[in-house]
Amino acid sequence: MNPYSSKSTYIALVLAMLASVGPVVAAEDDLGLELDEAGKIKTGAVLQFDLARTYADKEHWSMARSRAELAAQGGGSGFKWKISGRADADAVFAIDSGFYPDAVRRDQQYQFDLRETYVDFSAGDMDIRLGRQHIVWGEMVGLFFADVVSARDLRTFYLPEFEQLRIPQWAARAEYYFGETHAEFVWIPSPSYDRIGKPGAEFYPLPRGANVRGEVKPDASLGNTNWGGRLSRLIGGWDVSGFYYRSLDVAQTFYAVGVNDFQPRHDRIAQIGGTVAKDFGEFVLKGEAVHTRGRRFLSEDPTAPNGLVRQDTIDYVIGVDVPAFNEGHVNLQYFARRAANHDPSIGSERTEGGASILLNTRVTQAWEAEALLVSMLNRTDFMFRPKVRWSAAKNLRVVFGVDVFGGKPTGLFGRYDDRDRVYTEARWSF
């Protein structure tokens, strides 16, 4: 039996079930750019510095990253464009030189990304967007479920805010409105995939000691494109949507290619799902469900091809957001994954559930406090994230926080029990 299979099996299962845990669902355009009446070019920028120190087990600096994001947009009647890019430089590899493997340093020390870069125009009654763009179908606080199109940068786990964690897709998107119904079709000729980093990184998803070969990404071809459609409508005060999406999975499937060797690859999957939301005045109710076919999971069965078995799954989540405290709110969510054709060899139960609670309050005009707890319910496995946010000026925000992980080494959060950290973030937008 593979000595890493039980750990990797459970990790891969829950990773695919529980997506990002962040404070809020961010707006699609973080820079807030708008065209003036004359259609002149507008520009914007964000400068950010993140500093983190891991204090559990081997104490070390785990982040000292400077980030700059620039954007411009313009256009005229019936035509608009946007271009944006982001550059990172992480000095932690100079501060704690030698702590991380060279492969991790090469992957994370310097980086430039083209962010949202697209053109918008109309063709009759249809609106079209071509280029690198965010396509966000999920609307839950703190979790990815129906947001199936987005790729994510997971090299710092699920800790960054969503607008920083999402990776735009190169896509063609067409939208059409008829009555109160909104139809959307997307085609992604060159998909982006989750970034999980290199073995030895702070939040690499497989246990330390696993031998991981280079990731295999599908070749660029018509057969390796992604596509899907979504319908949404307001019915009696309920915002309801349904979608179908066929894609090469943004998440990695770890193939067993040797006794202790794994290789991340991307399988073809199909997903059908929907979302629902309603504002009752005193609270907001939201829910999402996604049925996924074609995804495979690591198995303890020594006869399983490549150490994998196929499991069709249903992910669902229901949440309520209630205004409370001093200009704050409470968010409660229950989420679960159920295997439609459960195979016990994957090392999990047929239904794996969890819950989250988010408490937010304004302490003073400039200070805000927040705490997020996410826990699995089938076993001890949790993450706790208290923090305070200081609005130092109109365009300057500073955050101080702690990230605490707990549980068994096979758990989604427990495997990072020795990565507890304190951090600060300064963000200036202009």
What are these regions (language model features)?
Residues 79-205, 236, 407:
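Outer membrane beta-barrel
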